[in-house]
Design a protein with these regions (language model features):
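Thiamine diphosphate
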Residues: 1-148
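Flexible glycine/proline-enriched surface loops and loop-helix/loop-strand junctions
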Residues: 151-152
Length: 152
């Protein structure tokens, strides 16, 4: 292990800020980001897509305060592959996306499953198709999460 690597590893052992002693009212995306930091997530790779963008915004500013690293990736595929690499490096890592982005991640998810690499992907579900709930509500994101991948 070279000097840069050992110094970097030491900096990632910082503890997250202590939870607030008072009760807080949080939106789901805020709670997700804070929970990940309190659980020890120290690497986040993401690509902005609504409705998960708030997680990416919060992680980009807060993870560095805990000694972690944030990377905005070129797309959702890169995000999934980056967290697989971070896990291989021994870091707790996650990404966040929504239905269309989760669809793009399927090959990487299948790869993580085959290599038994534990990863965390937050799939923030939309209320229905892209036009919203007034048109039709459905469960397609749940089906994609449960039955996705390419037959691996």
């Amino acid at each position: 292990m070279d000097k840069r690597t050992s110094e970097s590893a030491k900096s990632l052992k910082k503890n997250p800020p202590k939870p607030a002693k008072k009760e807080e009212v949080l939106q789901g995306n805020e709670a997700c980001a804070k929970g990940a930091l309190y659980a020890g997530c120290r690497f986040f790779a993401g690509y902005p897509i609504t409705p998960s963008t708030e997680i990416i915004e919060m992680m980009s500013s807060e993870i560095q305060k805990c000694g972690g690293a944030f990377i905005q990736m070129e797309d959702e595929i890169g995000s999934a592959c980056a967290i697989i690499g971070a896990r291989w490096g021994g870091k707790k890592a996650m990404t966040a996306t929504s239905g269309p982005g989760y669809t793009l991640m399927q090959e990487a998810i299948g790869f993580a499953a085959v290599t038994e690499t534990p990863i965390v992907i937050v799939n923030v579900q939309r209320g229905g198709p892209s036009t919203g709930q007034p048109t039709m509500s459905s469960q397609q994101d749940i089906y994609q999460a449960r039955y996705g991948r390419h037959g691996d």
